[in-house]
Regions:
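N-terminal cap/lid segment of alpha/beta-hydrolase-fold proteins
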Residues: 1-27
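Short, surface-exposed "cap/lid" segments of acyl-processing enzymes
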Residues: 16, 25-68
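Gly/Ala-rich beta-loop-alpha elbow adjacent to hydrolase catalytic centers
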Residues: 105-113
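Short beta-strand/loop motif that positions the catalytic acidic residue
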Residues: 140, 145-148, 152
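Conserved alpha/beta-hydrolase "acid-adjacent" motif
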Residues: 153-159
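Post-His helix in hydrolase/transferase enzymes
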Residues: 182-195
């Protein structure tokens, strides 16, 4: 399925939020909001894991929204240690105001989406390489998809297992994958597409 991509701006609590919106050829079945990795370490809406997630959701018929957090790209504001970034995501979800919202995120973005999920009750929650070491990541709803690389040295698999264990939360572990899923992006896409069909 081919997607068309457009840039839009959403009013956020710290100013304009830049978003790339990837639309399927036909009317969307829902909306996926995909959050990028840490803004102070090069995370943007063009991150390859974020783009892979967007392609998977478009293939499934969702419209994929990829916002830049405050202070990144053309988004206004400055980094707020995870507090304001959750509010940025909430502003994007409010702008969409549609049924069938999926929240997805990678690394820092996954931690922020886990925080937002308690407030907006998404249809689905997809967390990839969740940054559980440096951020308070709350328990997530049953049925959430949590994907992690076996060889992740940025957020070791053991740390994610320690976070997931008290929740009885299953994890999908991608063998041989490190934090950025080099040479494993196709597996990441397949997992997401299977989960959200």
């Amino acid at each position: 399925m081919r997607a068309t991509t457009r840039r839009v701006f959403v009013a956020g609590p710290a100013g304009r939020i830049e978003c790339a919106v990837d639309s399927p050829e036909s009317s969307p079945r829902g909306y996926a909001v995909i959050a990028h990795p840490h803004p102070q370490f090069g995370g943007t809406l063009d991150n390859k894991v974020v783009q892979t997630l967007a392609r998977a959701f478009v293939e499934l018929g969702y419209e994929a929204w990829r916002p830049n957090f405050r202070g990144v790209g053309q988004s206004e504001g400055r980094y707020d240690e995870g507090r304001g970034e959750v509010e940025d995501l909430a502003a994007v979800v409010a702008q969409i105001a549609g049924q069938g919202i999926v929240l997805a995120g990678f690394s820092f973005g996954a931690a922020m989406q886990a925080r937002l999920a308690a407030r907006v009750k998404p249809e689905r929650l997809v967390l990839v390489g969740t940054a559980v070491l440096n951020f308070d990541v709350p328990p997530v709803p049953r049925g959430s998809l949590v994907i992690h690389g076996e060889q992740d040295t940025t957020v070791p698999l053991a740390a994610v297992l320690d976070w997931a264990r008290p929740q009885d939360l299953p994890l999908v572990v991608v063998p041989g994958a490190e934090h950025f899923f080099h040479r494993r992006l196709h597996l990441l896409r397949d997992i997401v597409e299977s989960y959200c069909r």
